[in-house]
Amino acid sequence: MVFNLENEKDKKVLALSNFLIDNNILDHNELNSLIERIESIYFNKYIEEKVFLFAITISRPLTIDIWNALYEGFNELNEGFKADNESFKLTITFKENEPFFKSKNSFSSVTIAIIKDYFHSFFSKDKKYKILIEQELSNPNFLSYENDELKAQCQTKELTEWLVQKSKSFIFWMNNAGFKNFNFIALYPIDKNESKLKVKAVTVSQYDKQFETKVFATEFIPIHKINQQIDDVKIIGQIFELKTHESLTGKKTLNIYVTDFQLGGSLILKWSYTDEKKIEGITIGNWIKAHIQVERDPNTQILYGIVREINPVEIPNNYKRLDLSKQKRVELVFHTKMTAFDGINDIEEYAQFAKERGWKAITVTDKDNIHIYPKFYEVAKKYDLKAIYGLEFNLTDDHIKIVHNPDNTKLSDATFVIFDIETTGLHGRYDDVIEFSARKIKNNSEIDHQQFFLKIDKPIPKTITEITKITDEMLEGGIDQQQGLEKIRNYLDDCVMVAHNGINFDLPFLQTQFEKYNIKPLTNPLIDTLCLSWALNPLFSSHTLSNICSKLKLEFDDERLHRAEYDTEALKKVFFYFKKQLKEMGINTLTEIDQNLNKKCQIDLMKRVFTNTAIVYVKNQRGFQNLYEMLSIALTDHNANRPLVLASSLAKFRKSFLLTENPVQGDIFKAALTKPINELEKAIEKVDFVLISQPNAYLGYTLREGLKKELINDAIKLVIKTATKLKKLVAVASDAYFIHPWENEYYKAIVCAKGLGGKWHRHFNNKEKEQTVPEVFLHTTDEMLKRMSFLGEDIAYKLVVENTNKIVKLLDLNELVPTKNKLYPPVMQDSNQKLIDKTWKQAEKRYGKNLPKLIKERIEKELNAIISNGFGIVFWISHLLVEQSVKDGYFVGPRGSIGSSLIANLIGISEINPLAAHYLCEQCHYFEVSDSVDDGYDLMIRDCPKCHEKASFKGDGHNIPFATFMGFSGDKIPDIDLNFSSEYQAKAHDYVRKLFGVNNTFRAGTIATVAEKTAYGYARNYFEIIKRVDLATTAEIERFKQKLIGIKRTTGQHPGGIMIFPSDHSVYEFTPCGFPADDVESEWKTTHFEYDALGDAILKLDILGQDDPTMLKHLADLTKINPQNIPHFDKNLISMFSSNKPLNLKPGIVDEVTGAVGIPEFGTKFVRKILEQTKPKDFADLIRVSGLSHGKNVWADNAQKLIKSNRLTLRDVIACRDDIMLYLINKGMQAKDAFEIMEKVRKGIKVNAKEVSLMQNCGVEQYWINACLKINYLFPKAHAAAYVLMAWRIAWFKLYHPLSYYACLLSFKLKEHDINGFEKGYEFIKNRLDELNKLYRIKKIKPKEAELLTSYEVYLEMMARNIKLQQISIQNSNARMFVEHNGVLIAPFITIPGMGEAVASSIVEARNEKPFASLNDFKKRTKITKKHVETMEQLQLFDEFEHQDDHKLFN
């Protein structure tokens, strides 16, 4: 055989051939015979590869080294085959006439030596037993062979049991090596009471039957087919999750979650490794092939794999989904995961899929929203794709028909014909009428009645017989279709028709049948009682005939339902009732029904109306603003349980769009099934082009409505024929809701999940617990051409490829940008000048008229950056807000980096002074910078060295660079977050609206998506619904969960974000708007785009609500002390953060060593542990602790280790982002370089080699550089300082005004209370605290228990400080505040379990009017319930009343 040495595969075959010859396994003749016999034997569907057969016969003993070399050789050869997407299977046979292969009685000494090698090779792989095995093998009597039994005489029971456990795998391994028909026995010395451990090997014949002799078979078993323990198997799959576990000994196990994307096809592979290099290539998203052993977890009974070998591999061909067409199609309908409860994929996945297949453009058509547009723009740009911006929406006429063809006929004069038809299905074009029933009414009396059956030429569908009880036998005496339909037409003519759902079903069905039999259509009026009921009975949840009768108390027999004869009888009663209602409303004619009810009941009608699913595409840049306005109107003015676009609204903006319909749910395809040709033509005339989909996209019609697949094809052809006749372009779209066909299962999981408001998905039948999901994945060009081949090759190509590309050319895609990228600040007259004047005025007021150079230069630098970049308005608005809040008596706590600005400090936005530590005299303004401390609050109060005023020389300044707030060049948009009291937040929001107007102020919109726990629930629910809980393994649930996370559920609003739009621009230039969660009762509208998408263009104010400013306000009210007058320097207060000694606690009550319990930002267990370990010495250290506790990878495995191991202090480690910039500048680095390194590190971006070198050249210690490399996020120092200042003030009240402090802490910070428990005393509280701490440590504590844990800690501290807490007092308790009474704190009414604030307030309001005279009086004048009373009686709260006859309030 001639080998091509340029071919890698041939080279490997040659190398293996030489190996076989060199080791006397085969001779030349045998080898040639082998190679000539290589042939393609079958095609493996799972991995889509050709599989070649190798067969060799071995006729001599092979030592273990040759055996292993043979194994490795064939694995190498396999790699060569894999490179060509091929595989091979090796079959080895052994000559059985040699003693080595088939023992009679015993083996030779040479054979025994080889067996020992095999034994050692197999069993010594386990490190735990390797030494024991080697020791045993040194004993010549350890292994013996006689009578077809290989015996291992062990010295320990443990080893014996382990050998027994592994025996099956060993025997199989030895069978494949040629040792046949022998048993393996493991023995050890036993007592009389013990029995010998013995495992009989499965005989070779059984093994041959199960495994044949495929030692090196490289076929892969699909993961979803693994359903039992297997000793040796190979799989291929994609990694979707990695989790590393490290033991106490440092051994690392990587849990690799892999899947083959089939239902139940996920498995966790456990791989123990020591070398980090081994896991290269083992990353999420990569495909791997693995050689594993499948075991079953004894606890969960779930299968998992133990990795023997694992390697990255190319994606198998059947998962590649290549698009090989020279010209690609363009997808025109795709829904991302922003289509609520209906889309699966993120836009990035979609773009990547398109790019990999050579597509040039992609489309998004999410339903009822365009949240994805900003990200779509960025992603399309990233992948160099043209973005087609679409929107799918519910389209309806402005006027909702109640009467078809209304005229001025008076209801009192009309002759009505109430009718109903029974049919073989829902589709007038393909189904038939089988029963007709009608009753003629005149002057409220029935004057005639008709009922008859119509013959059909095929059996009645089984489902129709089940519903209507009409059988084939009943039709035998019926009229033929032509005669019957003519009779129906004549009977209905010249009367006012009345039918339930007549406009949408009965009349179109009949008109289509009339067309089919050349019968003249009906033109007379029809009253639809379904639509009429929508208007007259808006509160009915259902408007079926049976439910209407039930609600109106009209006699109705459910058993006789769905027969035309009985339905008309019931409908007559309903119509008479409705007629009476219409008369009472003053409605007397058919026209008045239609017009008056549309005016009065438009929203109620909109909630129920059957809509058309339309799609528009933005044609040009102007189209965005028009689309945003049209969508906003739908989301606000016409939001009737769903956003509706009215026809008039669409017409107003029509020129900016291309209009079509959803190919499956639109009116065009429905008309092809159910309406006459003229109605189909009307539908097609309305659109710019027609979309159809591939037949399997319409499977919902088959599964739900019984429409046969061949009729779907016929309807598609009818649409094409009619559109072509009308000269409308027709194109094919996937109508996709996910990308890959195997993602269908994820989609089904969402279909089975109950949506918001308890609504079920359109593809889910909750009654039957069945899904009717069509094939709606994203098709490649090749796939779509194949699906549409029933049209013929030329037509299919035209519709799939040519026409989709023609449509793209109708759009101007080159300049489309959905959002603006420059700032459009709101305008407020003279705001810049007011800011400048206020700044200098305040600077002079504080520092004197002759400002120090340091301060003057800082102000000038900041003002220049703020004003020149158009940010003055931001500062001025913030100033007005804070000023108003302070006027109203509420302090404001800033957060974020605003404290980096001196101007913010001067005009009152921030209390954080960013200057370096300095002294300032309150009297003479003498200013002096101090380098003796890191923070100005650590400067002791002194007498002024200049004017000698006592205690007037005070420290300030936290040394924070301005660059950390607005960037090195001062051009970063300032993000000013203000923490208002939660009691004042709403007033602050309203104040902004008052300043700028309702039409210019919006809440920042958010998108609520499926969270992790919800996704887990959806996944579990799906497996339960399909009754395959056995497949719901940990790995499989994880796979589903990951895909379901992030799917849109609804919209929301930022807790404090207010977007201010410029008054000289329309909001629609920037974004659509709507209501949070579509709540039309909401006081605020929200932006449709999230803040991040608008941040470069629109000013956002973060007006947040927090309890800390509320608490501070009430502390000030209780103590009459202004928090701003609390001293900056206080050694006792500093000490309290790391020690409880300043609190003077009674010994033996509190275990906590710090005094930080209940202090905001410092009271959590995590931060208290940091305080305990670091022991902060000053205010600067407290800021560092705050930074460490809020950063990511800053404390744990970083600063914590440095402080513990290197004996460093808080001052030596990186705690806040500003530390980096200040430290590097101090080391001599240029400010810009220091800033850029700081920006990288704070965002978790690794500094590069050049920047590391720059730090090293400046003398930066290596531990400091290493710390930078670990950090993922760094907290701003200004933010930390603001938190610490708030904590400092509250801590001061805790230390010096404990009763007021605990009253406010219990009122505003502790969410759960156990007043009864407090009264039970120390032992009870301590025991409960210990129980909850145990749950906390093992991470099994519930949220409510976690809140109680904090409360119990506070209770113990109160006991240790001798502060008493008393149960609720009807005469003295407040509604929601703990109040001081005679030196004791009294609990409020709201702490009564189950009592809300409204009920609690009603008690106080009634008591304030006059004291309660009795229990009965208490009951009458408050909002308490029976349950409340029972609880209050259990708490003995009524004991302060005298026992009267009315003691029992509810008898």
UniProtKB/Swiss-Prot annotation:
Q: Where in the cell is it found?
A: Cytoplasm
Is DNA damage given among the entry's keywords? no
Q: What Enzyme Commission number(s) appear in the record? A: 2.7.7.7
- This protein's UniProt keywords: Cytoplasm, DNA replication, DNA-directed DNA polymerase, Exonuclease, Hydrolase, Nuclease, Nucleotidyltransferase, Transferase
Q: Which InterPro entries match?
A: DNA_pol3_alpha_NTPase_dom (IPR011708), DNA_pol3_finger (IPR040982), DnaE2/DnaE/PolC (IPR004805), DNAPol_HHH (IPR029460), DnaQ (IPR006054), Exonuclease_RNaseT/DNA_pol3 (IPR013520), NA-bd_OB-fold (IPR012340), PHP_dom (IPR004013)
Task: Give start and end of each Exonuclease domain.
Answer: 416-575
- Identify one Pfam family in the record: DNA_pol3_finger
Source domain of life is Bacteria
> What family does the Swiss-Prot or TrEMBL record give for this protein?
Belongs to the DNA polymerase type-C family. PolC subfamily.
Return the protein name: DNA polymerase III PolC-type
Q: Which organism is it from?
A: Mycoplasma genitalium (strain ATCC 33530 / DSM 19775 / NCTC 10195 / G37)
